[in-house]
């Protein structure tokens, strides 16, 4: 089980020089330039080309996107035997009080996996959970306040578990978005994103009775198996699960980034009928959807997925664009990326020991800013 911790961030204020002193006029790995120590016609390695052009001759600490992390234990939300607290939301400050929302289980036995799980015994640490919230005056000392959003009524799309929340502040109201599953919870269960809203950060919360985002076009599972990896076709990049929503307000619209799974996660391993299938999408990617209203409809972007790496979605406005922290999975993991349009992300910095599934305190996340200032701490 995870213990919630607070982290602080040092973001350097230097700007990338980004190839201002190097003019590339050959496609044959030859750079002509006026830099000391280099001569016209000198051939360079691919690494040196990147150093001069992409990284602008800077050391990591001179890069404005370079980030280091320090970690401190939270007070008030310490580890508790038999209880899972995880997946903190964006942190908000309302009337000098910080609020964070998170996945929490009741005190129960240890998870037993999908095959052995029952209506009262969890399959994993995010099973049989509700959305709780805690408050703080200083961001370090926290007090758990109770349930914000509980599981839905029996037979509903969210009757098994609600988890991985994020909070949106929009036009004087508050919206919680979260991953949801129904009973029975198996390897092949579809995951959706639900929503509840309130006029206060403390509730009461009004549950939206249908998901606001669902998986995309499905593939086909092998009927003779119950394994998620055993498929006949993949479907869309998010054909199996949409979850870990993370939101910003931009262009007066609600922008939702989310973690996505295709059907067939793990299908690179041998399976009854799936051997030889060409895998079109990574196991973990980041999707993007836009809505005019917090209740939707959320329209998925045609360039999805907007990141082929990462685990949870984590975004914030930065300068005139959108930044994202990519962790845990994929060829571009452990990087800070940025896109002026919020869609076509590029690696801007590599990072070490980033927080997984973090919740950020970012004051301008919902302000529709065109000059994002970043963030300095989170949970």
State each model region's role:
Residues 6-10:
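Sec-dependent N-terminal signal peptides
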